[in-house]
Amino acid sequence: MAANPRKILVTCALPYANGSIHLGHMLEHVQADIWVRYQRLRGNEVHFICADDAHGTPIMLKAQQMGMEPEQMIEEVSKEHQADFAGFDISFDNYHSTHSDENRELASFVYTQLKDKGYITNRTISQLFDPEKEMFLPDRFVKGTCPKCKAEDQYGDNCDNCGETYSPTDLIDPKSAVSGATPIMKDSEHFFFDLPQFEDMLKAWTKSGALQTETSNKMQEWFESGLHQWDISRDAPYFGFEIPGETSKYFYVWLDAPIGYMGSFKNLCDKRDDLDFDEFWKKDSTTELYHFIGKDIVYFHSLFWPAMLEGAGFRKPNNVFVHGYVTVNGAKMSKSKGTFIKAGTYLEHLDPECLRYYYAAKLNSRIDDLDLNLEDFTQRVNSDVVNKIVNLASRNAGFITKRFDGKLSETFAEPELYAEFANAADRIAELYETREFSRAIREITALADKANQYIDEKAPWVVAKQEGKDQELQDICSVGINLFRVLITYLKPVMPLLTERTEAFLNETLTWEGVAQPLTNHEVTKFKALFTRIDPKHVEAMVEASKEDAAAAQVLIEAAKPTGPLIDEPIEAEIEFDDFAKVDMRIAKIISCEAVPKANKLLKFQLDIGGEMRQVFSGIKSAYTPEELVGKHTVMVANLKPRKMKFGMSEGMILAAGPGGKDLWILEPHEGAQPGMRVM
């Protein structure tokens, strides 16, 4: 236990609640979890929290596509996210949602504090507006032709083809990605956070060591280009929190999303009696706060977030740890290639500890992209974890169990060798602390090589066959198992499940301090397989399943596309003109109309078709009252063979259009058309 335990609050970026967790997300959560588990292993008090980012236009629109309320959708997504994180043994103390009472209260409090201190301004701006959906369009919901390279179907903020950035109003032939309509410009009052007022504070903070060198340098570029006021409001319709004191104005998702860190911690504090929210968030807090994020959201966490905290009277983070992107097999993750792999799909095929180890073996403290090469992944895990580390135990445990009733030697035979392993603790600890996980793994595997070299040289399988060598055999195997024990202790933050199985075998809870002394005269349990090597066939199956996931998702996307009359009811097969000519359609005047007793849908008509009266029954009662129709002109099929019905003879058919129910409209001719005229 640490003499003076640190009090640490750790967060991961909040996953957006409109899709599944994939292996790109998992990089960050594994990285943070390894660091958190290391801190706990050293006796520090750590609170590890996260939440779903559950607001914004994309969530509102996806819920509409799925035919459900946003609240229902984000609840279902949250369950899936939490199951995925649990599957990878991410040890959150609390997982919450930005759509919560705690977050609403805190977002309102932060906004009010900023407003009262003069950091909120308002002005009228012009934005693109979808006239069909009656909503303002975020940049990513406008598509058109790039003004620079003329590539079609580009988003409203930048071109994927040439990389140009621009305003959505610069697009050629812009269209709403929601409805396909041509957007119009419309004015609206918006609220802005006055970020430039915090420039001096931010310049000092970004150079204080609170950011990685690469991030700090990037901040200086943004300072040189000038800070701008930040639009923190959105107009209805919008799924989020209404701005206090305003009508149909909502907080932009990036205002309440980082406050979600506070909301999740507040939710945890309310569940426990031993946690004080203010101790961790007050301006003069002596606790530590760390955010793990991806490089795509640096701007928000390094400028807006610390400025909001400063303005509202809260503490700022000690550090923001930024990581790069994940590529697979040297390229961007691809759905068609099966390398866009969901966390759930991975868990159906492979052990989560394999990915945790591989990520650790490649992670460092810089903002480098990490490539998940699936062939290297298989080879490295099998070589390092199975052949070098776990095999060390299996090579020795059998002899200890069968020949010595599970008892290790009373004295340790190789104190100098053990000291070399134990003395690596401080070096490896520093690497974990500074997030140089790949270097820590290299140190551990180098020690594993030495341990295996010792066993190879001593050859216990040979000694076991020699008379009078029992003590030597017990000593060799006890050394091997003790070295294995040290290696697994060092791997405990990375591979918690392997550690649990090892602790059961060793009959001991592994602690960092415990590596200082070997186990002697200690009884271990019967050895069971601790880890299974990766079968390349399982990797291939995962890739194929990811292709199937992508295909299934495309089916859902197609199913969710906007529908229309031609989609819902396609045009029938072509007919010859002679077939059409057989249909005699005439203008008819509605002389009388009445409801049919005991009939839910039928109206009874008397129609004048130019000197001849016709009685017709029509199923449009749900759309019209009889009184609305009397005196109108309409179109009927006049040569339809009369049909005897329960309520009388129907001598034709009135033409109407629409999907049914209340949405039916009879056909009405222009003025001048007379009863009996033929419709050509």
From Swiss-Prot:
Residues 579-680 form the tRNA-binding domain. One of its GO terms (biological process) is methionyl-tRNA aminoacylation. It comes from the Bacteria. Pfam families: Anticodon_3, tRNA-synt_1g, tRNA_bind. A motif ('HIGH' region) lies at residues 15-25. SUPFAM superfamilies: Anticodon-binding domain of a subclass of class I aminoacyl-tRNA synthetases (SSF47323), Methionyl-tRNA synthetase (MetRS), Zn-domain (SSF57770), Nucleic acid-binding proteins (SSF50249), Nucleotidylyl transferase (SSF52374). GO terms for cellular component: cytosol. It is found in: Cytoplasm. ATP binds at residue 335. Its cofactor is Zn(2+). Keywords: Aminoacyl-tRNA synthetase, ATP-binding, Cytoplasm, Ligase, Metal-binding, Nucleotide-binding, Protein biosynthesis, RNA-binding, tRNA-binding, Zinc. One of its GO terms (molecular function) is metal ion binding. Zn(2+) binds at residues 146, 149, 159, 162. PROSITE patterns: AA_TRNA_LIGASE_I, TRBD. Binds 1 zinc ion per subunit. Gene3D superfamilies: HUPs, Isoleucyl-tRNA Synthetase, Domain 1, Methionyl-tRNA synthetase, Zn-domain, Nucleic acid-binding proteins. Homodimer. Is required not only for elongation of protein synthesis but also for the initiation of all mRNA translation through initiator tRNA(fMet) aminoacylation. This is Methionine--tRNA ligase. The gene is metG.
